[in-house]
Amino acid sequence: MKNIVDDKILLTQQKLEEIEKELEHLINVERVNVIQEIKDARSQGDLSENAEYDVAREKQGIIESRIRELETIISKAKIIKADLGSSRVSIGSKVSLENVESGEIQTFQIVSSIDADPFKSKISNFSPIAQALLGQHQGDEVEVDVNEKYSVRILEVINE
């Protein structure tokens, strides 16, 4: 996993809370439901040709696997915090930038790949644009190489 630093997984506080909520739901709702589905399927008799039993057991395996995955992420989570008050771009920063040539303005937050969600304007710290911006400051002009090179000007860096 690329977002492991010293065996820690980089997450925003918001993403950690989402993962904890998902884990709680899996344990308290999904796991309980699938156990009941298995009991119901067992009560139908012969398990060798019981498709409902097989489906429920497969579903249980998927749920248990996801629970273990989430527990591992939580146990290794390191909350990323932007450099408060700094104009330097870091993981967690919200950045507004302008394409120097087209004048197009984009705003997004740089997060870990686990947090990344382009539909919510959250990009991975491993994306080419984030790699070009990390460590730069408000007002800097930076060259980005995504299939072709272009320049952007950092208009604003918000670290909260």
Curated annotation (Swiss-Prot):
PROSITE patterns linked to this entry: GREAB_1 (PS00829), GREAB_2 (PS00830)
SUPFAM superfamilies: FKBP-like, GreA transcript cleavage protein, N-terminal domain
Record-level GO BP terms: DNA-templated transcription elongation; regulation of DNA-templated transcription elongation
InterPro entries given in the database record: GreA/GreB_C_sf, TF_GreA/GreB_CS, Tscrpt_elong_fac_GreA, Tscrpt_elong_fac_GreA/B, Tscrpt_elong_fac_GreA/B_C, Tscrpt_elong_fac_GreA/B_fam, Tscrpt_elong_fac_GreA/B_N, Tscrpt_elong_fac_GreA/B_N_sf
Residue ranges the record marks as coiled coil: 3-84
Top-rank taxon: Bacteria
Entry keywords, A to Z: Coiled coil, DNA-binding, Transcription, Transcription regulation
Listed GO MF terms: DNA binding; RNA polymerase binding
Task performed by this protein: Necessary for efficient RNA polymerase transcription elongation past template-encoded arresting sites. The arresting sites in DNA have the property of trapping a certain fraction of elongating RNA polymerases that pass through, resulting in locked ternary complexes. Cleavage of the nascent transcript by cleavage factors such as GreA or GreB allows the resumption of elongation from the new 3'terminus. GreA releases sequences of 2 to 3 nucleotides.
Family designation: Belongs to the GreA/GreB family.
UniProt name for this protein: Transcription elongation factor GreA
